[in-house]
């Protein structure tokens, strides 16, 4: 269970880093807003799912 928790936590950190860099870039380029909007929604959904997963796994690991 600890390995799954660590993998989820590392995934959350990596997705957070990608979103911190990617969101301003997506907003700064108006040409590809339609494509970027889909990726932003997908990234946000993955981030929320990972936050909930890490919270749930933290309950079982600790």
UniProtKB/Swiss-Prot annotation:
Membrane-spanning residues: 8-28, 41-61
Keyword Signal (UniProt): no
Key words, A-Z: Membrane, Photosynthesis, Photosystem II, Reaction center, Thylakoid, Transmembrane, Transmembrane helix
GO cellular component: photosystem II reaction center; plasma membrane-derived thylakoid membrane
GO biological process: photosynthesis; photosystem II stabilization
InterPro entries registered for this protein in UniProt: PSII_PsbZ, PSII_PsbZ_sf
Subcellular location: Cellular thylakoid membrane
Source domain of life: Bacteria
Ligase recorded as keyword: no
HAMAP family: PSII_PsbZ
PANTHER family: PHOTOSYSTEM II REACTION CENTER PROTEIN Z
Family under the similarity heading: Belongs to the PsbZ family.
Function: May control the interaction of photosystem II (PSII) cores with the light-harvesting antenna, regulates electron flow through the 2 photosystem reaction centers. PSII is a light-driven water plastoquinone oxidoreductase, using light energy to abstract electrons from H(2)O, generating a proton gradient subsequently used for ATP formation.
Subunit text: PSII is composed of 1 copy each of membrane proteins PsbA, PsbB, PsbC, PsbD, PsbE, PsbF, PsbH, PsbI, PsbJ, PsbK, PsbL, PsbM, PsbT, PsbX, PsbY, PsbZ, Psb30/Ycf12, peripheral proteins PsbO, CyanoQ (PsbQ), PsbU, PsbV and a large number of cofactors. It forms dimeric complexes.
Protein name: Photosystem II reaction center protein Z
């Amino acid at each position: 269970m600890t390995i799954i928790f660590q993998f989820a936590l590392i995934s959350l950190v990596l997705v957070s880093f990608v979103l911190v860099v990617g969101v301003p870039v997506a907003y700064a380029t108006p040409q590809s807003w339609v494509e970027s909007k889909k990726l932003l929604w997908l990234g946000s959904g993955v981030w929320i799912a990972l936050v909930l997963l890490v919270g749930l796994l933290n309950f079982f690991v600790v």
